[in-house]
A protein has these predicted regions:
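Short gly/pro/ser/thr-enriched loop/turn and capping motifs at secondary-structure boundaries
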Residues: 52-54, 75-77, 147-149, 169-173, ...
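PLP-dependent aminotransferase-like
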Residues: 28, 38-105
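General beta-strand structural signal in soluble alpha/beta enzymes
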Residues: 20-23, 46, 69-71, 110-111, ...
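Active-site C-terminal subdomain of aminotransferase-like
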Residues: 168-215
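Active-site phosphate-binding strand-loop segment of PLP-dependent enzymes
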Residues: 78-148
Length: 215
């Protein structure tokens, strides 16, 4: 049964690579994604599209990461204090920022696919293209907690390194289960990442998952 569930989750994420399952909320899967791939003080680029993008940024800061939060460039008469909360990610801003990062200090780009608080959906394929066009090695991490199984999502095709999701939205299951879909690049990064982790550690989970069981 365990192997079937893991295989079926790969189909939902549209990936040939591992999907890790946690008994946790989506917040736990956020932390798992960051702690398995990054080290204290690493610089990450995030984009404010709503409440959950802001909360993910807050969590990353608490983990000891250096976060840089980009915001939508423009005005909104309905939300003058938070105009980006009614707009998706601007891939051109990510492209420009990565081009300026000549020393490749930015280790990851973190964006929300579908912002639960507003319903705004971002073009993840465009974000991947922005990273590639800038010839930047940053990992791409995507929160698709309310997007998975609700809107088109292609982990492999869109070149995502870590996709984060949960059970209670598009999958229409009880809350309390969350997921990391991980690329080979993400797994390789986890071998040198220095952020502390125990419960969230991918290595032991992946090893035992090969048998269809969990630690």
């Amino acid at each position: 049964l365990g192997l079937k569930v893991l295989g079926d989750m790969q189909k939902i994420f549209q990936t040939r690579h591992p999907v890790i399952i946690y008994p946790a909320s989506g917040t736990g899967a956020w932390e798992a994604a960051l702690s398995n791939t990054l080290s204290p003080g690493d610089h990450i680029l995030m984009f404010e599209t709503g409440q959950f993008a802001s909360l993910w940024n807050k969590l990353a800061t608490r983990l000891g990461l250096k976060t840089e939060l980009l915001s939508w460039q423009g005005t909104d008469e309905h939300l003058p204090n938070a105009p980006g909360w009614r707009r998706g990610v601007q891939a051109d801003l990510i492209h420009a920022r990565l081009l300026a990062d000549k020393n490749h200090e930015i280790k990851a780009v973190c964006v929300v696919h579908n912002e639960t608080s507003t319903g705004v959906t971002s073009n993840i394929a465009a974000v991947r293209k922005a990273i590639d066009d800038a010839k930047h090695p940053a990992l791409l991490m995507v929160d698709t907690i309310s997007g998975l199984a609700s809107a088109e999502f292609e982990h492999d095709k869109w070149g995502i390194d870590v996709s984060i999701s949960g059970s209670q939205k598009g999958l229409m299951l009880p809350p309390g289960i969350s997921f990391n879909a991980v690329s080979p690049r993400a797994i390789e990064a986890s071998k040198t990442a220095k952020l502390p982790r125990s419960f969230w550690a991918w290595d032991e989970m992946l090893e035992i998952n090969k048998t269809g069981y969990f630690p």
